């Protein structure tokens, strides 16, 4: 009996190692914690445009907006005018910090229960990932699709007077939507606080409207009794 239990333990351990090793690698450059002291541009997006299933996020240029790459398509959002935003698609852009991963296949899970804030997303992602053998010591991308009762997201704005779109005292603009259809693109890591997640959490999440007319950094969410779908990277 002891030998059987030992065999099962070793088998499970080896499976965990194999699973972790096969997850699509997450890359990051620059660091969120440096924003405010420097806005050095560390990556041109066109240098990674050859990845057909790229997912990624970071600020646009010197805090001129937000970048979200979804399945190899780069979305760029800016909000230079009070109450207004623009969303375009372009690879010829730069970012001071950026996180990305190339993911061609996903495992799909249903999320049960309400989501009332970004922390709830973090907890749901961690719980489902752990239950399905993911190693939470390794960073990974995720996405969530569905209809959401309410979503609030912001688009950062320039902090330096010499940068296009600068407005004194305004560091970002928030936009709120009800009954919003779309998807959240996110990255989970327990070891990159201040790099590509905030210091008080393990996730960095952007929201992209289904019709691609809005994109921004997720601040608030509310779902009540709706079925939403979580996608985690499939072993490759």
What are these regions (language model features)?
Residues 1-24:
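Bacterial Sec-dependent N-terminal signal peptides
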Residues 38-96:
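N-terminal low-complexity or amphipathic/hydrophobic leaders
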Residues 24-49, 205:
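Start-of-domain marker
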Residues 64, 139, 202-204, 215:
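Extracellular structured ligand-interaction cores
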Residues 159-211:
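Short, hydrophobic/π-rich interface segment
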Residues 114-173:
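Mid-length scaffold segments of soluble, non-membrane domains
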Residues 206-236:
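C-terminal structured interaction module
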């Amino acid at each position: 009996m002891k030998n059987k239990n030992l065999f099962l333990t070793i088998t499970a351990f080896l499976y965990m190692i194999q699973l972790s090793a096969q997850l699509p690698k997450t890359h990051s450059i620059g660091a969120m914690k440096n924003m405010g002291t420097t806005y050095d541009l560390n990556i041109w997006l066109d240098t990674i445009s050859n990845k057909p299933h790229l997912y990624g996020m970071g600020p646009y240029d010197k805090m001129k907006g937000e970048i979200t790459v979804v399945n190899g398509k780069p979305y760029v959002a800016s909000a230079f005018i009070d109450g207004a935003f623009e969303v375009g698609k372009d690879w010829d852009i730069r970012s001071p910090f950026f996180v990305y991963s190339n993911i061609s296949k996903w495992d799909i899970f249903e999320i049960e229960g309400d989501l009332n804030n970004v922390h709830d997303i973090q907890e749901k992602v961690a719980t489902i990932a752990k239950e399905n053998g993911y190693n939470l010591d390794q960073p990974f991308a995720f996405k969530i699709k569905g209809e959401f009762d309410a979503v609030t997201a912001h688009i950062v704005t320039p902090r330096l007077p010499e940068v296009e779109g600068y407005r004194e005292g305004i560091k970002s603009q928030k936009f709120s939507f009800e009954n919003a259809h779309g998807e959240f693109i996110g990255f989970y890591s327990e070891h990159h606080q201040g790099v590509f997640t905030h210091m008080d959490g393990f996730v960095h999440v952007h929201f992209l409207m289904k019709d691609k007319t809005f994109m921004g950094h997720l601040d608030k969410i509310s779902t009540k009794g709706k079925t939403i779908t979580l996608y985690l990277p499939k072993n490759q």
